[in-house]
Design a protein with these regions (language model features):
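A short SAM/SAH-binding and catalytic strip from SAM-dependent methyltransferases
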Residues: 114-127
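Conserved class I S-adenosyl-L-methionine
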Residues: 1-40, 54
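Core SAM-dependent methyltransferase catalytic element
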Residues: 193, 201-219
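A short acidic, Gly/Pro-enriched loop at the edge of an enzyme's catalytic core
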Residues: 105-115
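Short glycine-centered segments of the SAM/dcSAM-binding site in methyltransferase folds
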Residues: 44, 143-145
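C-terminal alpha-helical "lid/dimerization" subdomain adjacent to the S-adenosyl-L-methionine
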Residues: 149-192, 199-201
Length: 219
């Protein structure tokens, strides 16, 4: 069972900057996402679950053009504060919003070039993942892209063992793993709504990450 929104907020308020310690398994997947998301020509990025702003900083430093804007949201006030400190030098190009916990993207219909979410959907219930995908489809431009990274099922002997152990901990006490569990992102994207342009799994130190880039199917 997924954590309540209040439990998630309390956990990540306490966790704070320690979230950056997960870079040892996250960075390779984030780099792969960046390499395939064609970010150099976009003008607007929305990140659902910005955390400490670590990935946003990477995008603003190395991937986005100097005219591109970034908007990020997070449920945790501590994470928003850390992201504000980290991204302050980018001035008006950056907007950070503390989420109420509702699955909502603060953007007009068909106004965003890229919707990004990394290591967040594995925290949500299946219902909330579907709601997020619906919101992402609403705000993306017709040629926009949904860019995702998540914990996923292991593909090697070691990562399969890690998956089993992680799921056991999640069932026993979700708070021990921050409310996150391995999920299959591809199973949550309705084929009538999304066309997957890129799909890859990377394993680092026994932890498997799924990378997906999808485009909205024209209606």
């Amino acid at each position: 069972m997924s954590l309540s929104r209040n439990d998630v907020q309390r956990f990540y308020d306490r966790f704070g900057s320690k979230q950056d310690s997960q870079a040892f398994y996250e960075d390779a997947a984030l780099a792969d996402l960046t390499a395939h998301a064609h970010l150099d020509t976009v003008q607007s990025v929305f990140e659902f679950g910005c955390g400490t702003g670590r990935y946003a900083q990477q995008l603003l430093q190395r991937a986005l053009s100097a005219s591109a804007t970034y908007t990020g949201c997070d449920l945790s006030s501590v994470m928003i504060s850390l992201a504000e400190q980290r991204l302050r030098s980018y001035g008006e190009r950056v907007k950070l919003v503390q989420s109420s916990g509702e699955i909502h993207i603060e953007a007009a219909d068909h106004s965003v070039d890229r919707v990004v979410s990394t290591y967040v959907l594995d925290l949500l219930s299946d219902v909330d993942i579907k709601a997020f995908a619906t919101e992402a489809r609403r705000v993306l431009k017709p040629e926009g892209k949904l860019c995702l990274v998540s914990l996923t099922q292991g593909t090697t002997s070691a990562s399969k063992l890690v998956t089993v152990l992680w799921k056991v901990l999640y069932r026993l006490r979700p708070m021990l793993v921050g409310g996150c569990r391995p999920v299959l992102l591809s199973a949550h994207l309705d084929k009538s709504d999304w066309s997957v342009a890129y799909h890859h799994t990377i394993v680092r130190y026994g932890v498997a990450s799924e990378i997906i880039i999808a485009v909205p199917v024209a209606t």
